[in-house]
């Protein structure tokens, strides 16, 4: 990774993060959805974004597949590329949090070290790890993209849960049962955001 040039300096903005948050009426924060492919991350994150939007909360959803069409289109699925994928997404999420948004990210992000890296980059109280815990057998039965079938057939290498490890969170801010109804999971997340004074009741 390239080092910073000594002539590149950080410029403070005239409008502060606090002012942006006052404008939005809520705090800026990242909800980092993690779990196996097919666990329901994107589905739950999308449903939560809809619920927040209806409440007037300024949001943005960053989806694992979508960013690989542009921001991360040059990356593959090696451990090194996955780390860089998460680093880039973390930096984008950080900028959005500075803008006062509630950012929802739906990424397998299989390694604890990468998730911790983003947590530290965001800072205290700005990173909420959401573990969508769905058994591998259920994820494989759902297989919405047909990826498990390809992985089992040897057509897809380095697939998380099959021939690449997934490190489950040890201390996620919220642990969701991915077999529950999406509406129930959204209510749990809304309760957490309200109790944490991120959004208003």
Swiss-Prot record:
GO MF term list: adenylylsulfate kinase activity; ATP binding
Signal peptide: none
EC code(s) of this entry: 2.7.1.25
Organism domain of life: Bacteria
Residue ranges of the TM segments: none
Residues annotated as binding ATP: 35-42
Catalytic activity: adenosine 5'-phosphosulfate + ATP = 3'-phosphoadenylyl sulfate + ADP + H(+)
Protein function: Catalyzes the synthesis of activated sulfate.
Name the UniProt record assigns to this protein: Adenylyl-sulfate kinase
Organism: Klebsiella pneumoniae subsp. pneumoniae (strain ATCC 700721 / MGH 78578)
């Amino acid at each position: 990774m390239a080092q910073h040039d000594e002539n590149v300096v950080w410029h403070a903005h005239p409008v502060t993060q606090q002012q942006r948050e006052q404008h939005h009426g809520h705090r800026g924060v990242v909800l980092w959805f993690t779990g196996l492919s097919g666990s329901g991350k994107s589905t739950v994150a999308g449903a939560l974004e809809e619920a927040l939007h209806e409440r007037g909360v300024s949001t943005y959803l960053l989806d694992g597949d979508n960013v690989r069409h542009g921001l991360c289109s040059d990356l593959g699925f090696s451990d090194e590329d996955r780390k860089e994928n998460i680093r880039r997404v973390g930096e984008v999420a950080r900028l959005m949090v500075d803008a006062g948004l509630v950012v929802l990210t739906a990424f397998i992000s299989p390694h604890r070290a990468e998730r911790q890296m983003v947590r530290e980059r965001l800072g205290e109280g700005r990173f909420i790890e959401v573990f969508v815990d769905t058994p591998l057998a259920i994820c494989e039965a759902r297989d919405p993209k047909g990826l498990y079938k390809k992985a089992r057939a040897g057509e897809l290498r380095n697939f998380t849960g099959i021939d690449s490890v997934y490190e489950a969170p040890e201390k996620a801010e919220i642990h969701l049962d991915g077999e529950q109804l999406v509406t129930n999971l959204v209510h749990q997340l809304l309760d957490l955001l309200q109790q944490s004074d991120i959004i208003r009741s």
